[in-house]
Amino acid sequence: MIKYKIGFLLLAAGSSSRMRGKDKLLQEIDGVPQIERILRQVLKLRFPVFVTVPATDTKRKSIISKTKATIIEVHNSKLGMGHSIAEGIGEITKNYDFLSLAICPSDLPDLKMGSINHLINYFFKSPEMICRPVARGSANVGHPVIFPKKYFEELKSIRGDSGARNIVQKNKTAVNQYNTYDASYFLDLDTPEEFTNWMKRTNG
């Protein structure tokens, strides 16, 4: 089994329940669906990328399958983000040996390759610690969050919709905060109104 320093798990198995019938990951920005938009940025980093999707989904899978990312089908994805993370990590560790994994939702429209790279470089200054971005001057935390290998077993056991938050809280002294003014780590779009307002701001 080949060892890798880091891999990337992109979470795209959510139901977009707050979008009132629309799939936020298929919403187009400059003619590109959001899921493809963030994938393009992550894939520029040239390390293995995995994407969780609902097992019954076809549209998201169709977009992802045209890239070099590996699709992980999540059964019972309605059980929440924690379940998707656990399924994703479980599948990844069957076939790959990563020293760390970055985990990130797919609904961050402003996240770019450069920002991800800055976070990864910061993580490798203390690669035994969990690393997450924190908005400078506030308590706002963002994504991706990078976990060393020693947390993979815990990640495989989480459930519910709180994601990996409980693991981070339980290991507060082992968390390396990346303090930043870069808003792209923190902005996600969950409702039609948020999406519309973001488009207005972006387009001036």
Label the model's feature ranges.
Residues 1-8, 157-204:
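Conserved alpha/beta core of the MobA/IspD/sugar-nucleotide pyrophosphorylase nucleotidyltransferase superfamily
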Residues 25, 48, 70, 174-176, ...:
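Conserved beta-strand segments of alpha/beta enzyme cores
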Residues 30, 72-77, 178-179:
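Short beta->alpha connector loops at strand-helix junctions that form conserved
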Residues 3-55:
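N-terminal glycine-rich phosphate-binding loop and ensuing alpha1 helix
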Residues 14-16, 56, 77, 106-109:
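Short glycine-rich anion-binding loops that position phosphate/pyrophosphate groups of nucleotides
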Residues 36-100, 114:
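Conserved N-terminal catalytic core of the sugar/cofactor nucleotidyltransferase
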